[in-house]
Curated annotation (Swiss-Prot):
Organism of origin: Treponema pallidum (strain Nichols)
Domain Radical SAM core: 93-308
Molecular functions (GO terms): 4 iron, 4 sulfur cluster binding; isomerase activity; metal ion binding
Signal peptide: none
Name assigned to this protein: Putative L-lysine 2,3-aminomutase
Co-factor note (free text): Binds 1 [4Fe-4S] cluster. The cluster is coordinated with 3 cysteines and an exchangeable S-adenosyl-L-methionine.
Annotated NCBIfam families: KamA family radical SAM protein
E.C. numbers: 5.4.3.-
InterPro entries to which the protein is assigned, alphabetical: Aldolase_TIM, Lys_aminomutase/Glu_NH3_mut, rSAM
Keyword Iron found: yes
Pfam family, one: Radical_SAM
PROSITE patterns: RADICAL_SAM
Amino acid sequence: MSMAECTREQRKRRGAGRADEHWRTLSPASCAADALTEHISPAYAHLIAQAQGADAQALKRQVCFAPQERVVHACECADPLGEDRYCVTPFLVHQYANRVLMLATGRCFSHCRYCFRRGFIAQRAGWIPNEEREKIITYLRATPSVKEILVSGGDPLTGSFAQVTSLFRALRSVAPDLIIRLCTRAVTFAPQAFTPELIAFLQEMKPVWIIPHINHPAELGSTQRAVLEACVGAGLPVQSQSVLLRGVNDSVETLCTLFHALTCLGVKPGYLFQLDLAPGTGDFRVPLSDTLALWRTLKERLSGLSLPTLAVDLPGGGGKFPLVALALQQDVTWHQEREAFSARGIDGAWYTYPF
């Protein structure tokens, strides 16, 4: 089935009114209302109880409902990443040439109040139906240019062991070198999901990358650290991603502590994201000028091992954009006539390099 045929089928199905297929077209107001219930996992509640002062508040702010969520700004929309234009099926997004995104479920262990798929998560759609999974497998087999698949949702690890293993075996049947990225918040929200059986299975399914979403050093309790160490010890590469959130982790000290701790655990800090323009998330958004200033300081304090890529998903489907390009503008001067550029060095002096 071609992408065009899949897209036409998706539009037809939307007309049938299946809730789990039309969330991207919801109004911003409906997404920002009280639709996304407050839901906190026992493991995360335990982390909150263990944390002190500002750390406890930072964790609570991520999962506890606040009235500010009802405020919708003009720039916000239900589908801030513009995924709708790239949908092959309602559960598969093919935005980049060599990789696709699969929504395996609409369920999460906890509800992040800044979620950019809050309309989808609010519907709490269950595990992807078998017929939808088979359409994805068919598409992957017909599209050999796809070398990676991001398995996301929701959180894929909310599925049963049988569901997860069946899905991963189906994906692995496509090609032995298809890279599977497991995008999950379970490391912090539900570390018990990483059983020895699951880790052994993921080893069997290599190449598999674990992509945990971790925002604050207080999310790295002893159990969470043990999970990451177990994954790394089993030979599973782990690359984290974090979202910059006002009142949670928008300080140099907090982020330096987090990224250094992850690196010590063998986890590569992958991305630090500027917040997406999802409805009702404005209170979490750090002004871009502050973000760039913060990252410049992080760059001075952290090595390449510990420093993540600063990025934003451009609204409307423009894809990931490295904000490093903006952060370093003031540190670079181009000399076209001299066929060279000058850059500010670590000592503050300017140095010239020829084209």
